[in-house]
């Protein structure tokens, strides 16, 4: 075998929808768990000095049954001042949570056993332009696309569920930081999101869209399996060890996507019809 000179690898490929994983759990496992193991083996054999980033998920923490959840008028809140930290017990829910969690653990173990330079970023909701969000995945982009195109939206649950949202350019800066500066961070997991400051519920998100002059039509449906009532990332560890913080507020990021969707209305109409 011949070693390749590769500086960094960012593993983003995945089956991304909880609902799809319930319909076809074997395919979900093959893509997320086995697929990640295949990539780790390739790194081990051909580029063991490359820095490897795994795009993991907050779903590895499950329904957060150990966390006290408080219901407010427009959102759920938790009794943790900074959000959910990496010390929260892992508790995979849904086939998607299991497959991503399995891959997450392999990524960390390959650092321990084979001394690879791997990290797992347990990401909350990532959003930005060029995100072709659909009902099952990419909810923030999906809401905007559907609203601009005059489509009705389904809210699964009561709309009070909360996520911290992270603009994609902020995430890219973190990836670059790790590849350039990530010394002695092998085998670590980091919660990565917008944090409490950049969190919002679905109902609060709808209010932001209305403030931007958009008319939105929606209905309510049943909760989906594995859907957390609230998840907010505690970014303390990644801030301390990599010197990174999210910069783009939800209002700013949403404005960027609304502008992009309006500019590419015809393309997105074709995508929606498919």
Tell me the role of every PLM-derived stretch.
Residues 171, 175, 192, 202-205, ...:
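Non-catalytic, hydrophobic alpha-helical segments
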Residues 1-126, 244, 255-256, 263-264:
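N-terminal Rossmann-like NAD(P)+-binding domain of SDR-like oxidoreductases, especially those catalyzing
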Residues 101, 114-117, 126-142, 149-151, ...:
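Glycine/proline-rich active-site loop of Rossmann-fold NAD(P)-dependent oxidoreductases
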Residues 23, 31-34, 87, 94, ...:
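Residue-level signal for the nucleotide or nucleotide-sugar donor/cofactor binding architecture
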Residues 158, 188-191, 203-206, 211-230, ...:
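C-terminal "lid/loop" region of Rossmann-like NAD(P)-dependent oxidoreductases
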Residues 24, 42, 46, 146, ...:
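Generic structural signal for alpha-helix termini and adjacent loop/cap motifs
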Residues 250-274:
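Amphipathic terminal alpha-helices
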